[in-house]
Amino acid sequence: MDLEWKIEKRERHYQRFVTSDHPDTRPGRGLGVHGLTAAFYASGDDWIPAFSVARNPDVLGRPQADRRFTFEHAPYSAVWRDAVMFWAEEHAIEDADRERLLTRTPEPALFSALRRRMNEEGNDIPTEALSSVYREQRDALAATRAPAQVLEAALMDDLNDWQRRHKKHRDSAA
């Protein structure tokens, strides 16, 4: 019976780990699981947005610094994937829970809200700090606009050709 109780306790602990924020997670930073949060880190005069993964102690039991996944060199969705994969590996997360989290990419607006909250807490994070967070969205928007601009130019060429032909036809009929 004691073994059964320990197994049930371990399962409850695991379910809480993969379905709720850690109780010590500060407001606006939680992503719905223990050990994975949204953050801004000060680096000199800059504020760097990142997903942060809590790490297990090293082999000697010493705490390790969180691993930060920033948006400087990769798009938002890829950074989320990398952070979730590392979190799952670091904390021995089951495949189904890892996959569930991979499909729930938080909106970049999370970082806008976090920036506001942290500024209310006394920080001074400029809006420019969000630039790398929204880069993927800006690139996608630019990609959808480019074909529309090409189509618009082609339609204008067709319209101009039609107007020239129509004017020529009118002039010759007169």
What are these regions (language model features)?
Residues 62-78:
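A short, exposed loop/beta-hairpin motif centered on an aromatic-Gly-Thr core
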Residues 47-64:
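Short, well-structured beta-strand
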Residues 1-51, 104-174:
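Basic K/R-rich, polyanion-interacting modules in nucleoproteins and related proteins
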Residues 10, 73-75, 79, 87-90:
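Long, charged/polar, surface-exposed segments that mediate recognition or autoinhibition
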Residues 98:
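Nucleic-acid-interacting cores, centered on viral/eukaryotic replication and modification enzymes
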